[in-house]
Amino acid sequence: MKIRFLAGLGLGLLFCFMGSVKAELLSVATAEVCAQQWASFVGQGQADELTKILDDSYQHTHGTGLVENRVEFLGALRSGMRKYEPIQLEEVKTRLFGECAVVTGKFALKVSIKGKMMEGVNRFSFVVVQTPQGPKIVSFQATAIKPAS
C-alpha cells in the first residue's frame, strides 16, 4: 500500500514538475501570439494592454529609421500623437533560439502622425524572449518596402 502511494505521489510530482517546465518554454505559437497581440493592441491604440507584453528594455525601430524606447513608443500612442489603423501581420515566419524567438513577416501600414497620414508596406521583425513574467517583446523593427516603379 505504501509503495503504491509513494509511486503515485512520485508520478504526480513528476507531472507537476514537467508541467511547470513546459509552461516556461517559449514556443513558435507563443511567440506568434505575442506578435499578433502587439499588432492588435497597436492597431487599436491599447497602450495599457501593450505594456503587458513589452519588456522594459523594448526598442522600437520605425520604417523611417526613428528609434524609440518603450516609454517613448507608448507615450506617442497614449497621447494620440500617433494613431495606427488596424494592423494585419502577413507571411509570418518564426525561428526559435532557446528562450528567444525571431518573428518576421510583412504588414500594410496606415498611421496618422500629428494628423498627417502615412502609409506603405513594411517588412517587420520582432524579438520575443521568455522571461519569468512570461513572453515579452524586446525589439521591433520595420523596414519600408519601396513601391515598384
Task: Report the location of each language-model feature.
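Bacterial N-terminal signal peptides that target proteins for export
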Residues: 1-9
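Short, low-complexity N-terminal intrinsically disordered segments enriched in polar/charged residues
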Residues: 12, 18-56, 149
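A solvent-exposed, acidic/Ser-Thr-rich amphipathic alpha-helical stretch
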Residues: 26-29, 46-97
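Hydrophobic pocket/interface hotspot
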Residues: 38, 49-50, 58, 73, ...
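Short, cysteine-centered beta-strand-loop-beta hairpins and adjacent loop/turn segments enriched
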Residues: 82-83, 110-119
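Short, surface-exposed coil-to-beta transition loops
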Residues: 87-89, 104-106, 119-124
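A short hydrophobic beta-strand element
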Residues: 99-109
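Short beta-strand edge/turn micro-motifs at domain boundaries
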Residues: 121-148
